[in-house]
């Protein structure tokens, strides 16, 4: 259709669209330097929160940590910080939100910047080529948001188009890929910087006999940030894609209200986790796979490479059993969980990074461990599932 003085708006619309799928062009990760050993964490935790006399509860926490399949985690909160801010070590008795947010407002963008700089360095292109920024966190609700702060720390151009993804939790690592795909494929030449930065200072608190799900969270979560450069139609010989984002979906698991939830209050973000979560995910995940891969005539889930959010070892065990997966399929997920714990939205990007690196080190033919097609799953509050179909890139 032509309008005005011979302007062809339809041609203009088509010219704005990319030709190919969005690709992940670079990945960067970052963690705080403070490392917590899971085997000694119960003793440390009950000491710094002044609960050493509660030996029965400490024994329960030890068993939770022993069953977590986690070796170590990175945490911003050190013993020195906790001693200076004892309100963080109370359970729900003392308001602490101001203290937490003062920390998070600085640390969340800072760690995000660190991951972003690594991704930009790998990408090898000037920051001036970044057209969009997607920033994700489940921590700080300040205005302007952490997206603004990261853009400022990185020195991005003021015209970079920002999108904030806040309070989504563990499924958001898939959400940001879905958004990045839409932005990259509908804006020719766009280069989208995706940053996820998560910090457990928002949830750390003392123990309680009446809130054992809080102890589960304290045994699982760690701090980390991830960053990716996403764009369609990579420049040959200049940009080096590692995965293509083929298809995305989001769904809410039936009858799962309240299975995973968090409430931001004066005492920080309180965490609720029901024991039914592994069952809910494992009994519904095949529906997501069928929806995603029937259009590609794929029904053998062992013919995919897997990037699954490590919500906990019970979830992974039940998914593996329900789908009869080869144990190698979740190897990268289990490795990241073991070394870093559950870093919420950033986790699946760490697993993507681990998958491509292990694939090259092991002499595989593609970035997906020798497989062409793969799936990325994010699980989180709702209970929400993000499904992302990925295509690997052949190694030269």
From Swiss-Prot:
CDD domains: CHS_like
Subunit structure: Homodimer.
EC number(s) per entry: 2.3.1.146
Function summary: Catalyzes the production of pinosylvin from cinnamoyl-CoA and malonyl-CoA, and dihydropinosylvin from dihydrocinnamoyl-CoA.
Organism field: Pinus strobus
GO BP annotation list: polyketide biosynthetic process
Record-level Gene Ontology MF annotations: pinosylvin synthase activity
pH dependence per the entry: Optimum pH is 6.
PANTHER family cross-referenced by the UniProt entry: CHALCONE SYNTHASE, HYDROXYMETHYLGLUTARYL-COA SYNTHASE
Family, as annotated: Belongs to the thiolase-like superfamily. Chalcone/stilbene synthases family.
Disulfide pairings: none
Subcellular location: Cytoplasm
Protein's gene: STS1
Site location (Responsible for the different enzymatic properties of STS1 and STS2): 313
Enzyme category, top tier: transferase
Induction: By stress.
Name assigned to this protein: Pinosylvin synthase 1
GO cellular component terms attached to this protein's record: cytoplasm
Swiss-Prot/TrEMBL keywords: Acyltransferase, Cytoplasm, Stress response, Transferase
Catalytic activity: (E)-cinnamoyl-CoA + 3 malonyl-CoA + 3 H(+) = (E)-pinosylvin + 4 CO2 + 4 CoA; 3-phenylpropanoyl-CoA + 3 malonyl-CoA + 3 H(+) = dihydropinosylvin + 4 CO2 + 4 CoA
Pathway: Phytoalexin biosynthesis; pinosylvin biosynthesis
Misc: STS1 has only 3-5% of the activity of STS2 and synthesizes a second unknown product with cinnamoyl-CoA.
Catalytic residues in the record: 170
Binding annotation for substrate: 60-63, 273, 311-313
